[in-house]
Amino acid sequence: MKHLSISAKNPLRVALAGALAFALPATALVAPAVPAAAQSGELDRVVAALRGITTMKANFTQTDRAGRTVRGELTLKQPGKIRFEYEKGTDMLVVSDGKAVSFVDYEVNQVQRWPISNSPLGALLDPKRDVKRYGKLVPTGNPNVLSIEVKDPKKPEYGAITLVMVKNAGAPGGLELASWVALDSQNQRTTVRLSNHRYGVSVADSAFRFRDPRRSSRRPG
């Protein structure tokens, strides 16, 4: 497994990078199996909901295992593009241009990149990632909430992501992505919660570019 070289002096930075790179399933999410027929039908709904998103903006709150929290705005454009714009004072950026996910640290002038397919975010961004094939419905006890753990058993090094979908008639496919959870190889659990979803908004491709801090120390405006 490739280890990220993000500065270890800031545990939050390590957690943010790890959660978006390689992750392992959380044992706390293990639950009794859902009947196959129910699995298939609900997973079809999840796939339709995720694929129904063309563009989306939402506010996010990202919390690591120690309870450290950062906030910002997420911008998504299918296929494959996403941007996590962190709040002022957090000199980091996570962006995918449709091919690779980049973790940009403006504090230490570093950029880490890895293919979308090697990231748990591939469940959201990679059209080749078959959520129905690799997803497993995890019981929640709430008929309005679906929890789906997505991982490729043949490639455990690619990690896993657990998506939490909430029934919402106003969302594509009637399901809204409320949050996701990742647990990295260093046992650092990260939770991302979304709010204030806006669908079908105009998003330029330029939103998924960034100024490389290795060439310039200035953060993009």
Sequence positions of predicted segments:
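Bacterial N-terminal signal peptides that target proteins for export
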Residues: 3-26
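Cleaved targeting-peptide boundary
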Residues: 37-45
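An acidic-aromatic
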Residues: 71-125, 190
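Gly/Pro-enriched, hydrophobic low-complexity segments
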Residues: 133-134, 139-220
